[in-house]
Swiss-Prot record:
PROSITE patterns: RIBOSOMAL_S4 (PS00632), S4 (PS50889). SUPFAM superfamilies: Alpha-L RNA-binding motif. It comes from Shewanella baltica (strain OS155 / ATCC BAA-1091). Part of the 30S ribosomal subunit. Contacts protein S5. The interaction surface between S4 and S5 is involved in control of translational fidelity. This is Small ribosomal subunit protein uS4.
Length: 206
């Protein structure tokens, strides 16, 4: 399955919520009708079945983190094999992706931009260049911008935007040094309450 390259707002309208796919401090502009699906007949919101509701939640989370279907299913399998709550394990695995950590630290304005920074070898983990977006970041790892990439306008712009919003408690960032520490894996209570991971567990358990 190819990665979606079309309008980002269309995906947010499809899921009926802001997926934070666009950069900026504020949420999506009020002109974007999130309660209405895209397309000519978007106003006619169909009544979803139980399966449809579960599928929409899975698609929403997959799009938030920018993960393809096969990758997402593999994350679920790993989460199911891990001791503890499968849904919480799934979200924690997604949160430890390097592209997501780069986004959480404010080095990229969006997860898509953060993924690009990783792929283009602009990111280092513990002093070594890592260009794999799905690389798993561990507690106490130090993530930094590579020296030769620190003058990039988009990184500076992202840091300015990030400075205006509250940083997650599980990362510690030094904007001057352009580096941050991943202090711990976030708990479920740290993450968005708008995600219902249990629906995803129910979907994949069938």
């Amino acid at each position: 399955m190819a990665r979606y390259l079309g309008p980002k707002l269309k995906l947010s309208r499809r899921e009926g919520t802001d997926l934070f796919l666009k950069s900026g401090v504020r949420a999506i502009d009020s002109k974007c009708k999130l309660e209405t699906a895209p397309g000519q007949h978007g106003a006619r919101k169909p009544r979803l079945s139980e399966y449809g509701t579960q599928l929409r939640e899975k698609q929403k989370v997959r799009r938030i983190y920018g993960v393809l279907e096969k990758q997402f299913r593999n994350y679920y399998k790993d989460a199911a094999r891990t001791k503890g709550n499968t849904g919480e394990n799934l979200l924690q695995l997604l949160e430890t992706r390097l592209d997501n950590v780069v986004y959480r630290m404010g080095f990229g304005a969006t997860r898509a931009e953060s993924r690009q920074l990783v792929s283009h070898k602009s990111i280092m983990v513990n002093g070594r260049v890592v260009n794999i977006p799905s690389f798993k970041v561990s507690a106490n790892d130090v993530v930094s911008i590579r020296e030769k990439s620190r003058t990039q306008a988009r990184i500076k712009a992202a840091l300015e935007v990030a400075a205006q919003r509250e940083k997650p408690t599980w990362v510690e960032v030094d904007n001057a040094k352009m580096e941050g520490a991943f202090k711990r894996v976030p708990e479920r209570s740290d993450l968005s309450a708008e995600i219902n991971e249990q629906l995803i567990v129910e979907l994949y358990s069938k």
